[in-house]
Amino acid sequence: MLHLKKSEFALTTTPSNRGLSHRSNVKHYSAARFVRWFMGLHIEWRKQPNDLGEHRMMLFALPGVGNVGKTAIDGLTQVNQCEELVRLHHTALPPLAELDEDGLLTPPHLSLSAIESSTGVRILTLSGTSQPLDPEHQGSLAHALMHWLSDQGVSELYVLAGLMDSPTRKECFIVPSSKEHRINLETAGVDVRRDEPSSGAIGLTALMASLGPLHGIHSACAIATTVGSSGDVFASQRLLEALDGWFDLGIALPADAQAMLSEKLASLAPKSKEDYVAELTESPDAFYM
C-alpha cells in the first residue's frame, strides 16, 4: 500500500485552493515552495504566504505592437521595489525553455510580481515572453487566468498595449469592457475612448482585456499610440506617465526614455568592433596584372 506523508500532499477545500495540492522540495531551476493545478494552470508560488495580498490594480502585458506594454512593465520592475509572487505555467505556451535570472533553465510561464511605491500603493504585474499560437489555446488560457485572478481577489485589470499610428500622434487612452467601469473612469477624469481600436484587437491580451465582466473583474485596455517599432520606449514612457496621472499611483517611473533607448541600442550593438579603415588602407597580399 502506498503511504503519503502529510507534509507532501494536502487536500484543500477552499474555493481558491480547490483540488489536490503538492508541496515540492525538488531542487529544480529554483525550488518551488508550493505548486498546484487550477483549470490547466500549473501554479508555482514563489513566496509565502500563498496569497496575492492587498493591491490597487493589476497591469498585464505581453510582447506586441511596439512592445509598448511589455517594455512599460519591464521598466516598472527595474526602477521599483519588485517581488515575484507566482509563476503560472500552461501547456498552451510555446515550448521554449529559457534561462532565468539565476542562469537556470525554466519552463515557459507567465510571471506575476508585486510592486510597492514609496507612498505605499501596491500594484501587481503579470507578463511573459510569449503567448499560445493557436486561437483555441489562447481562449482556454485567458479564461483560466481570469478565473484564477478573480478567485485571488483581483478586481481591476489593465492590459497595456500599443496602437500603430502616425509618428505625429502621441496619445494615451483607455478602452474598458463594461459600462459601469467606463462611467467610473470618465468620472475620475481618465481619457476613455469609444471608437478605438476601430478594427478590434486579437490575441491573449485582447481576451484578457475583454473577459473581465464574465469573471467579476473591471478589465480594460490602456493604449499608447506608436509607430510600431520594436521596443518603443517613448510610447511606454507616455503610457506609464498617463497611468500614474490618472490613478495617482505614486510609483517610480523610468526617468529618461532616451537613456533607456540608448541602453537598448547598446545591448544590440556588436561586441567586437572591426577596423574597416585599416582594412581598406592595408597593403594587399595579391597584386593586379
Each PLM stretch: what is its role?
Residues G128-P135, R194-D195:
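Surface-exposed cleft-lining segments at the edges of enzyme active sites
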Residues L62-V68, P132-P135, G162-P167, A201-I202, ...:
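Gly/Ser/Thr-rich loops at beta-strand to alpha-helix junctions
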Residues F38-T129:
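N-terminal short beta-loop-beta anion/metal-coordinating cradle
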Residues A144-L157, P213-H218, W246-I251:
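Secondary-structure boundary elements
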Residues S230-M289:
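A conserved C-terminal secondary-structure "cap"
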Residues P132-R182:
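Internal, conserved structured core segments that host functional sites
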Residues M1-F38:
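N-terminal amphipathic/basic-hydrophobic helices that include classical n-h-c signal peptides
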Residues D165-W246, F287:
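Catalytic cores of processing enzymes, dominated by hydrolases/peptidases
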